[in-house]
Every structure is written in structure tokens, then in C-alpha cells.
Swiss-Prot record:
This is UvrABC system protein C. One of its GO terms (molecular function) is DNA binding. The keyword DNA repair applies. The keyword Oxidoreductase does not apply. Transmembrane segments: none annotated. SMART domains: GIYc, HhH1. Residues 1-28 are annotated as: Disordered. The lineage of its organism: Bacteria, Pseudomonadati, Pseudomonadota, Alphaproteobacteria, Rhodospirillales. Residues 1-16 have a biased composition (Acidic residues).
Amino acid sequence: MTDLPVDEPDRDDGADQPDAGADPATPRGVEAIRAALRTMPSSPGVYRMIDGKGDVLYVGKARNLKRRVINYTQPHRLPVRIQRMIAATLTMEVLTTHTEAEALLLESNLIKKLKPRYNILLRDDKSFPYIEITSDHAFPRIVKFRGTLRKGGEYFGPFASAGAVTSTLTALQKTFLLRTCADNVFASRSRPCLLFQIKRCAAPCVDRVAEADYKALVEEARAFLSGSSKALQHDLAKRMDEAAQALDYEQAAIFRDRIKALTNVQSHQDINLPTLGEADVIACHQAGGQTCVQVFFFRGGRNNGNRSFFPAHAGDEGLPEVLEAFLGQFYAGFPPPREILLLTDIPHHDLVEQALCLRAGHRVRLVVPRRGSRRKLIDHALANAREALGRRLAESSAQRTLLEGTAVAFGLDGPLQRVEIYDNSHISGTHAVGGMVVAGPEGFMKAAYRKFNIRSPDITPGDDYAMMREVMIRRFARARKEDPDRDRGQWPDLVLIDGGLGQLNAVREALAEIGVEDVPLVGVAKGPDRDAGRERFFVPGRPPFMLRHNDPVLYFIQRLRDEAHRFAIGSHRTRRSKAIGVSPLDSVPGIGASRKKALLHHFGSAKAVSQAGLTDLEAVEGISAALAKKLYDHFHSEG
């Protein structure tokens, strides 16, 4: 997973013994590397190239650190991009490991965390959704789960998207009638909910199904999610026939509907390969200086969907090197499957396979299919990669044209690389949030979005100008601190403010207070009756103006403003819902998440807890006599 030429072996040619007098023609970076070589060990490990600002430029791994790093002392033998990296290097740091496989895992984790500018980077770091069958209740529930997989949990996936999980969950509800409600809701029900009425839940909350029968349904769901769908369908068909022969047509109809739901979920998956088991299919395609990696997830022989990835800094590398770097970062977030099908082999096949085995806790095979059904899966993934990259290149071209048009419309020089759009959201000043949306040549840069919870107690509720002042001061004070030289990509080429002249002047004054007066600002005021298409634009030093109603730049700015509005409203709703969801139990010392869950599970609601007697509180698992007394006193201190 390094950018050194893979066909060039590590050399030990004495370059780690620098001359007593440094050659003045030697680049500074080479001198820094030679200085680091004096004390560098020959063990496996990870090295980091660091520039004068302390930023990590590159992370690499090696079986022998000294022999690997020696390669950098002769930059003329390396690609131009790596020569630039060496020239910027001021110091080096190393971390030793026991084995090269451990070094590979550490390298992947550091790249994912530090995002060095000269490494191939996996830009989409979103987690993948799973289906979880809970194990802490007599009647387990089946739910969508996203996040770090907890030890002891029972998870099925990953799925490529939330939509793929939702459709599978819907089919599972229809087929197995498992509950999805939270435990406190389950404990407080006195009659079946709507899901029982529409035949998506067996209503164990009100004893409409015996515990043994419900456990049988759970086992069937496990079997289906584990890939035993054919055996399950055969068993259901047999039971349907038996019920029909016994003239129990109502029960036969239930089995028929369950078979239909199972068939439906399988028919919605384009490709299924029952013999594949647990595997990911990975192919990639390069064009126009960009790379697309396509991943299909197969679990239990079923296609759980696919996702496209567009790694950064991959244009100068070949497909094998891109795939190798991708594997390390991609599987840093979740355990790899038992088999990974690849379009082409990678330079360090055995090493990567060994590292993935360490990460997974079981054997992982990297396979390059040459023929048969597995090769067809690779070809299908490659076709998807080509299509996805073609769409992205077309969108990037259109986006660059729009950014160029925006620069012309507002009298700005040069291409726009980063445009920031701001909007506020609140209800009568409560739970106010400012939202920052970022766009660039490749579209919306969602990883750069930021929300600002309005904190100042001096702001009058509903004062949009004061809210925007706070947002701007916080945003650009941080930029001045973290990127004073404006070379880390944190400074915008244009700032769009959702508001007219008053809002624009408030922003200008706020930025002037912190010494920022050279960021281009534009106010976007809605037209009469807030009509889209009649916006007026306010640029400092120019009279207000409008764009032609059919100008593509106008539509582009409307889209940016709508995205900022959507993001700000979503952030406001999240903040408001958190405030609404605060429980009276949260203010009781000693009551954490697990004890709160136990209390709600036992009593059904926070109100019931507050009304409970001391003896009842002591009966709850995990609540000691002393804590029960503290809890009781908290709710009865005035009575």
C-alpha cells in the first residue's frame, strides 16, 4: 500500500550513511530523510512524512523500515508526485510493529484517521447498515442498526444502503412477524398495535403468540438471513399443504403469504448466487484522471446491494495499487467477509490476505476469478464502475461550467474550488442552529458540512442578524487558527448568505471584527412573495441585480440555497427532538443509560418511575437499595 514502484526492491546501498558535509544541492526533504535514517530501525513498522506545519504528508508501511525509507533518498527514481512530497518533508516519525501484517493494519488505520494528502484516500467513510436481532429480551426484536458492531450482538449484513435494509426488514416482518418496537414500548402495551392489524407482527407484547412459537419464528428469520432460504421455503410449502389437507385454510393462507413475501424479497435482488455464501465483489475502472471502485455485498448467497467509491489521489496509480490501498481502508471500518472477489490481483496479495485475517478473526481469501459465475459477477461490477464513473465525469464537467459561470456573474477571478452557503433555522428563536453547506467541482462536499448550535445568551430570540454574526465569527476564527496560510483548503472562494442587504452587512461587520475582509460575500434575497426565480443579489460595491430567469447559474444558486435550507432545518429538528426527548431520569445522579433502560423496561415510562414506591424501585435489576432511596427522594423531595 505504498506509492513506491512495486517492481523496485528495497535497497541497502549505504544511503543511510550521510556524508559528513551535506551537499548544498541536495533537496531539504532528502536531508531530513537521511537524518531520520541515522536512528531508524530495521524492523517492521509504519513511517510518516511530516511537513513544516506538522501536517502528515504520507503514511507508509514496510517489512524493514530502514530499507524502505532509503528509496526516498534518490527522488529522481520516483514519480513526480512523490518528488513533490519529498521536497515538502521536514521530519519523519516511525512506529514499529511485530509483523508486517500488523504494520499494514496500522497503516490503514492511520491513513483513515489522518487523511494524508499524498496517500490514496477512501473519501466515503460512512458506516454501513446492518440488520440486528436483539438478544437481551425473551421476545427478540429485529431492527436496522448502524454504527460500531457490539460484542455479543447478532448482526446480518452489511447492506449497501438504508433502502436495501428497509426493504429486507419489511419482507422479514411480513414473513416472520417479528416485533420492531423498543423494549419500553413493548412493556407498556395493553393491546396490539397497527403492525399486528396489517399482519406484520405476532403481538408478543399482549401474549398473542407463545414464547416457544415466537422463538421458532426468530430461528426461521436467522436461517433466512444466513442463506437457508430454499430450505425454509420448502418447509413453509410443506406446512401449507398439511394445513390445507387438514382443511385449516386460514393457517394455509398465512403460510402462503409468508412464502410470497420471501419470494418477493429475492425477486427484487438483481443477482443472487446461492453458492457464493459470504463475499464481497470488487472491481474498479479509471478514466479522465479519476477512479471508481464498485463493491457488491453478498451474504447468504443474496445480493445486499452495491456502492460506488471514488478514491482521492488515485489518478497516478494503476488499478492493482488502487485496489490494494482501497482494501486496507475499506475494511478498517468493519470485518471483511470470508471471500473477496477482485478484478485483478494486487502487489502484496499474501500480506493483505494475512492482515485481513487478523482483522476478521477468521480466514479471508482474496480471489481473482477467471471464468464461470464468479467472473460474471466481476464483469457486472466492472460495468457498474464504468457507468458510475461516466456519470461522475459528466456531472463534474457540468459542475465546473456552473462554477465558472458563478465566478463571472459575481465578478470573481479564477475558478471556484470551494463555495460555502449559510442559513439559520429556529422556531421563535428556540433551538437555533446555523448551517454551512459546501460545494466544489465535484458537487456537494458533505464531509465539510458544519452545523453551529447558537450558544450566546445575549442574542434576542429570533434575531437572525445576531445569529449569523455568531456563526461567521466562530467559523472564520477557527479557519484563521487552523489554516492561517490558507493552503489547507479550509477557506472559501465565495460565501453565499441566505438574506438581503441587512444580513450581508451583519456578516461583513462580523468578519471585520476578526480581521477577515477579503472573503468574497454575496447576499441572496428571495423575490417578492418569496418567488423562486426572482432573487436579488447583493455584492459589496455593486448595486443589487438579478440574473436572467433562464440562467443556469440562477438554478445552481437556488439548488445551493435549498440544500443549505434543508441542512439547517434538519439540524434544528435534531436539536429540538433531543431537547424534547430529555427524560426526568437524566437528572438523577447515578442513573446512566443502562439503569435508565432497566427502569423504563420495568415500569414502562418515566412517569411511572416517578410514582413508584421504594420497594418497587428496589425490585428493578441493577438498582441497589441506596440508589432506590436516592431515586425515590429525588421525585418525592417536596412531598
